[in-house]
Amino acid sequence: MNNTHITLVASTVATKNVGRITQIIGPVLDASFPPGKMPNIYNALIIKGQNPAGQEINITCEVQQLLGDNKVRAVAMSATDGLMRGMEVTDTGAPLSVPVGESTLGRIFNVLGEPIDNLGPVDAATTLPIHRSAPAFTQLDTKLSIFETGIKVVDLLAPYRRGGKIGLFGGAGVGKTVLIMELINNIAKAHGGVSVFGGVGERTREGNDLYMEMKESKVINEENISESKVALVYGQMNEPPGARMRVGLTALTMAEYFRDINKQDVLLFIDNIFRFVQAGSEVSALLGRMPSAVGYQPTLSTEMGSLQERITSTKEGSITSIQAVYVPADDLTDPAPATTFAHLDATTVLSRGLAAKGIYPAVDPLDSTSTMLQPWIVGTEHYDTAQGVKQTLQRYKELQDIIAILGLDELSEEDRLVVARARKVERFLSQPFFVAEVFTGSPGKYVSLAETIKGFQMILAGELDHLPEQAFYLVGNINEATAKAATLS
């Protein structure tokens, strides 16, 4: 397939199907081609030349619409500064293609699959187009198993599925990126397969921090790049919407190759899937589409579906995907997060209220869900403990109004006990992170699932009623809580 693809590109460039720019509106441009030589939808167009200042221009665009009168409308993958009407546009005859395989490991790429880490060219002998169809139903794998993360609140209340799709939902500044970094730290380091990280429309500083951290932890091996276990694909906030709209597909294409050809288990991290939707909405109006609910593009569900349906596990290998989802104005009913919900196996919802209390990770134990939390999957002990924790926290939530008006003293003895245990549970759900050591000064903790279950069982059974609630705050397992209590008294 790859050879035919490469020869196809070579033959089309040889015959050179050339058009001219007729209109430029921001990141969207129109080009006219000779009759009978119209490029196909999703074909890559290349514009080369010089701008008025004499600087070289090399811009790749993707065809989005055929307008009639031999005109096409395309979205640019980089800034359109310096383009003029009448400039030549060359049709490559094929969709955007990016390098895949072992040569991508340890490197940083942009949306076009070009390395941007100043470490020289990448062997692009094997390339794949970024637009591909999802695997057939007959190819899909339906095995159910838990993916342990070492984070108590996640493993106990909303466990992740191996080969599943997980969403981290939260508004601005509640800790989505820190949580995704911790998951990379806990899972990618211990994970035998490869990881692909797609930075979609997020801060460049965070992308740089992640790269430096991966080099320090040897996930990216500087001495021997080929031994690295991760490929990074960035299309950050400063990029035009065309790049942010397609960079997720570039990362996914690299992950699919490891799954389908190398038959590996792959981790795919995307930060942030909302920016993919946002970029689509930015170009949607310029492409002449009528906006739909809240100003989003009318094709929102289709675009999301075409990306998410490709992120799946087949009989060849699995892709476990962890995606951060920004929630505009903390409104989970906004069309962007609401559309994402439908595709996920587990949702980890971050709460501003918990972040304000200083409970990190600020995961809302009552809002977060997982299809894996079934007694026949996780076992009755895990299931019963999780349900007990949720019931205790739910009762505490119901009692909060009474406490606010009348005070704790007006509660029955039984309710006071529930409140005391719920506050301990709430604090024990917090945990020091490895990636946050620099902020907190506390060393990070990885807590196994067995230790997590044991700790919460002891709190719910009342075995630790004599300990102060501060002892449970920002500790790992239950033994650390009892040790901390001894230092407090």
From Swiss-Prot:
CDD domains: ATP-synt_F1_beta_C, ATP-synt_F1_beta_N, F1-ATPase_beta_CD. Keywords: ATP synthesis, ATP-binding, CF(1), Chloroplast, Hydrogen ion transport, Ion transport, Membrane, Nucleotide-binding, Plastid, Thylakoid, Translocase, Transport. It is a peripheral membrane protein. Its EC number is 7.1.2.2. It is found in: Plastid, Chloroplast thylakoid membrane. Belongs to the ATPase alpha/beta chains family. Produces ATP from ADP in the presence of a proton gradient across the membrane. The catalytic sites are hosted primarily by the beta subunits. This is ATP synthase subunit beta, chloroplastic.
